[in-house]
Amino acid sequence: MLRQLLDIKRRRERGLRTTLARLGEELQSLRLRQQQLTSRQAELHQQWRQLTQQAGCMNQATLSRLRATLCTLESEVERLAHEQDALIAEQGRLNQLRAEQETRLRLNLREQEKLQLLEEAP
């Protein structure tokens, strides 16, 4: 009976390790996406600075195009900020889930050790 319990604990351990690996991959993917967003935001800010540094006399059509472009850049920056906030929230959720899984794994390993000691005891 102890052997069966130990086998069950080992299967659970494998499942927990698989889940932890998957969570690690998801976190890595989120970090990569966050780096991409940060890079894109920097590009947009650079474009914004270039556009706002234009000097000289502009006609109505040129000014309208500039305003439209700046408005588009602003909405894109806002969209990226919202996406980054969502990524940060998801990272927090995954980190919490990962911590829970690590706790479960530690408990499982401790229980396995106890079962092994009971099995070896005369």
Please provide the spans of the model-predicted regions:
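Charge-rich amphipathic alpha-helical interaction elements
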Residues: 1-122
